[in-house]
Amino acid sequence: MAHHATAGLPPPTPWQRLTRMLDTERSTIRYIIFYAVLTGLISLSLPLGTQAVFNLVSTGAVFSSTYILVAVVVGGVLLGGILLVGQMTLVEAIEQRIFAKAAIEYAYRLPRIKPEALEGEDPRELVNRFFDILTIQKGLTKLLVDVMFAVLQILMGVIVLSFYHPIFIGFGLFTILGLIGVYMLNYQRALRTSIEESAYKYELVAWLETVAGRLDEVRGDDKEEHKTLARADELTSEYLHARNAHFRILKSYYAYGIALRTILTAGLLIAGTLFVVSRQMTLGQFVAAEVLIVMISGSIEKLMTSINTIFDVLTAVEKVAVVTDLPMDEHKNSIAFDNA
């Protein structure tokens, strides 16, 4: 998890920091991805099973096979829930290990940081960045479970839709390219405003800590109390300004997501209806396609509403690195390894 600044090299990007942090968890993440793929495949049992049941019922052929199909669909939903619990368990294990490693790394690095690197800094205030580990923990559940499943569900839904009619391939490509374009369009601005928001948050906390450290001087002194409130009000205003700037960008993500969902849903519904009328699709396929459209639309919504969490995690990784990027005293470092 340590990130040493290397002379002549640019600092790692937030995504690079996050991947390095999760590098030791690769085997566990592979299992999470495997579970997500299985869950995604099982989720397809709903539209495909619905199509099969609809075809049987519409022809008046209600046999035991119909009940078997219903049981398969219900069983798929149950199995998907069990796999979700497995994913959550694996993510919880990753979160606990990240917390433990961060705590040990901070405890190891703090006494070994070069004194000149701390000039003008309050080490106690810098340590507050450790609490962003909690933000990373909470965000990983969304990233490794919700976001991953939403992405896989969109990909699988698009692939299945393409089998119903070649036109749906175009809709699928439009969806994937649209999502990538929407994400990249405001990425830099969203990340910058998120980091600015976090900086003001820590500045406010640092001021409150300063006040807490000199309560005897502040208490009962009208001038000091006014100064305390005025500075807190100023920092709060700056934080809210930065937060509003960040939220405006998030709203643009939500708006693009709504527009993408609307265009996709309208296009697929109109195309599907025309294909049924022209007998290029059966009614059962149309019903299954509608279920897939709802699933894809829901996944797009989940991705857009999770965008805030993505930037929170990237910002948190940057803030944790404020301490881990500080250069260490090589002499103390070598002594520690010699004594180990």
Describe each region flagged by the PLM.
Residues 44, 48, 81-85, 158, ...:
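Membrane-embedded alpha-helical segments of multi-pass transporters/permeases
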Residues 26-27, 115-118, 128-140, 144, ...:
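An intracellular "coupling" helix at the cytosolic face of ABC transporter transmembrane type-1 domains
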Residues 80, 89-111, 115, 172-216, ...:
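Cytoplasmic coupling helices
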Residues 26-46, 55-100, 119, 171, ...:
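Transmembrane-helix motif of ABC transporter permease domains
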Residues 42-46, 54, 129-174, 260-264, ...:
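Hydrophobic alpha-helical transmembrane segments of ABC transporter permease domains
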Residues 130, 225, 322-340:
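Primarily ABC-family ATPase nucleotide-binding module
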Residues 56-71, 75, 160-174, 249-317:
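Helix-loop-helix
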